[in-house]
Structures are given as structure tokens and as C-alpha cells.
Amino acid sequence: MKDLGERRESGSVYELSAEKRVVSVKFGKRLSVRDVEGYVTALMADPSFIPDFSEIVDLSNVEELDLSSEHAITLADMVDPFCSRAKRAFVAQSRVQIHAARLHQILRNDERNIRIFASLAEAQEWLKE
């Protein structure tokens, strides 16, 4: 696991399994554009990363979302390192978390390959399908 956060409240921790072709990322209590950009920058620099890997985005710790609509559009359109056929599973439980995941799903215009789950186990199971 690569810890990309300076504090527990923000940042992210990601793990890449080239064997399983899955990237898992867990964000802290506060999610900002800087946190997402830091994760993407580290992922793009990782020589094991391939854009068609699957991804699990665990938002279960996020309590505060500090992303404007303009930031969300930029992240979805220009910063997102995954290709359109990659399966993406968001773990979200609260209204704030579900809103963040749903916003990305809408902006990427992909309800087939981007799904939202209440638990990590459900997300992992879907990626195995």
C-alpha cells in the first residue's frame, strides 16, 4: 500500500495488484481535488499501472467533500487515468459519499462499468464477474 496522505483526515492510500489487474484506493475523511490529483499522479507514475485495470474507490471514510462542479468535470474528463472499458467500483454509504460516486458515474456517462456499492465485499464480488 502506498500512503499518499500527509494526515489521516485527507489524502489517500492505494494498492495496485498487477496479478489481479486491480487498483484499490481509500480516501480519508476530507476529499478534495488535491487528494484525487495526488492519487492520479502517483498512479500514473507507477510502472505497474495499466489504464484498463479495474478500480475500487473506497469512500467509506469520507465525511467532507471539497470538490466544486468544475473540479468534478475536470477530474472526470481530463485527469481520470482509467480507460472507458475499465470496471470501476465505488464503495459509498453516506449521502455525501454516494453523491461523489454518482457524480463521477454521470460525468463519465457510464452506468455499466462504473457501479456504486455499500460494502467492499460487494464491490470485490462485482469485479470478479
Each predicted region: which residue ranges?
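Amphipathic, Lys/Arg-enriched alpha-helical "gate/interface" segment within cytosolic domains
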Residues: 2-129
